[in-house]
Amino acid sequence: MFMVVVLGYSMNPAVFRYLPFAGFFFVCTTSRAVLLSILPLKALLLVGNAQMVSVLFFMVSVCGIGVSLSVPFMLRKTDLQNGFLISVFSMAVSVAFLWTGTLWSFAVGMVLHVFSVTSMEVMLSLYVMQRIPRRQLPEFEPLRMVSAIVALSIGPWLGVYLQLRVADWLPFAIAIAGTVATLIYFRWLGLHRMSMPTRDFGAGNPLRHIGRFFRQPRLRLAWSLILTRSSWWMMFIIYTPIYASQSGLGELTGAAIVSIGSAWTLTLPYWGWFARRYSLRRLMYMGFTVATVMSLMVFVFSGTPRVAIVLLVFAALGATMLDGSGHVLFLRAVHPLERSEMTGVFQTYRDVANLAVPGFFAILLKFFALPVIFIGAAGWMMVGTLFSRYIPRRM
């Protein structure tokens, strides 16, 4: 069935035309993918334990929480192209800081990293809305997600492997090379020639858009569901390498689990087809349920690491089902004249996840052992299961 769905994509001329644009998301993601498992492990080395890693990531997120809301203001002062270039440049500078061996420079690098990732997500969402017709978004979104997370499937293991077996500096050099490749691909696609009218970037204090956003039930639902999904992945990315390292499995095994769990996204075209065939609501309900049950089982078997990591991989399958929806709930709900302002607010789900997950676990890990994180993750995924029932049946 999966091959039939993929073949169906390749035979659809309308979708095939946008494959180069979907591939752009692979290139954009390379810089952060190769450092994905390196960063929590380096943080663990610098601060000493998982609870302090949580505190560090929480403080970094506090510094970056306003980034998404400031993007429309930044775009008004520059334009879409320059905003994207600022994001890419910030990524390159952040890598240089992250390479150093001191805590203060690592913290500065993490703040810049949060800024670059968040602002780039906003820019790319705007480019998607400019380039892809609304009726083709449900078909394009799984391709976009596959392109981005193929990089996330390869990068975590490759980065740790190169750092441990070849040279400590090599993953950081690859990350910087990824920013250069992003700029080259950006111009090859002709995205530098695309623009948005200044009025589309909104005006005034971006904080005032929060009220407008959350007064719209469909936007509120889209934000809540993607927040729960993003929070689970945040837990998976940060704490899986730490759990593997502290349980005796080793850093490379932890990075491999992150890569394998992310590799489930190769099935995204199937889940996109499933959502169109049986409804997005059913897909998300099923994904949240699988992730909830498997996360609970990981906690139960956390004392047997080899069993726990297998269960964790299957929990990632549930989260991947949710990725099959992409940003469709938001993209179909947002008003065209408000897309810049509402995109800035919507993208705060990443900042809130970056803030809430380490903050929540910093408190839990003060009193409990590391496996408690899996109960926490199961808890909010259960909430997502309940919220998914509010997705309109026609979707």
Give names to the regions the model predicted.
Residues 50-51, 134-144, 251, 334-346:
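Loop-to-transmembrane helix entry/capping segments in MFS-fold secondary transporters
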Residues 2-15, 191-224:
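Juxtamembrane intracellular "pre-TM" segments in multi-pass secondary transporters
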Residues 170-187, 374-389:
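Symmetry-related core transmembrane helices of the 12-TM Major Facilitator Superfamily/SLC fold
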Residues 67-79, 163, 267-280, 365:
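Helix-to-loop junctions at the C-terminal end of transmembrane segments
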Residues 8-61, 218-257:
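Helix-loop boundary and gating motifs at the non-cytosolic
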